[in-house]
Amino acid sequence: MNSEPAYQALFLGAGPQMQCGVGQFARLLCEGIEKLDPGSCATLTLTRSDGSAADIWRAVGSARNVVCNFPIVSWKRVIFRPLLALAMARLRRRRIILIQHEWAGLHWLRRVTYLPALWLADTIVMFSPLVRRELADDRLAGWAARKCVLAPLPPNIVAPAGIAESRLRQRLVAAREEGRLVVGHFGSIYPGKQPNALLNIGAILKARGQKPLIVYIGSFIRGVDKVEQEFHARAAELGMSDDVIVSGYVASDHEVFGLFSAVDAFCYPLDEGLTARRSSILACVQSGRPVIVTGPAEPDEFNHHPRFKELIDRGAIVLVARGSDDDVYADKIVSALKWPSVQVPFDFDGWWLDVAQAVKAQF
């Protein structure tokens, strides 16, 4: 006789290896739903050494719903395990909630590996109407768009009460004291964020005598793309190699916001425009520094996310019209420095309550 599952939801993850933004989201979402319904959630760690077939079978059987987030960087070489977990969930008649954070911005090989997950999922949660349309327009996967629901994405990190000193922060502070213009970019560095575009803007600022220092607070995502090599080659081509810093992985929120405090303005020139899935933008806004971003491609991009829309309406996020050339971004950066700081109070728990309720509604 089959016993009732002990948990409402089983969250698949990679344990301490989940250092990417999606991995952090997976952990915080589990915590958020657990706050709504204490004792309702369990986790299953899937890595090269954790998560045997027997472990997966038992864990899947313990919950009514299985929740899986893609893409988690540390799963790139162990993708079979989460897919096996979803297949076992289907065999055991568990409901599968797939949270798909992006689509067209992924390398085509990664999209192919996710096709089985799209097929197995009962519901696909997405955070952006644009990304949902990307899925709908995909010739191989467009059929899965009918399973999609939208949820509001919260920030992964909240500004702490204090900041941490670091050598990099001291370097940035010293640069500002020397009259340099420190332009920031926060988050993982990969092709979908067009990291080289900011280099072009930096070169324009340099030609104008603004003495820019471009700091990328984050690390490169290593994959089949040669994004890091191409980035450094482009910086050298523009004569910007000595004007660019890449921090690498930053371990604590206190250190992240310490670096934020030494930035004059953030800039994100995005081919796809601003979307409601950009949690890195939400982190930057909390610094009170200007955040300059390409405007959204879709007029309804933020209809499902009133908190994000409010940040734009209040001027915390400065939009640049799509199709603008790099000179316009440079102009916005310089002009934004003259505006008063926009300090927006962040109800971190409220943001996470919104997404926890939206996902829990799919159980």
Task: State each model region's role.
Residues 118, 249-250, 257-263:
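Short alpha-helical donor nucleotide-sugar binding micro-motif in glycosyltransferases
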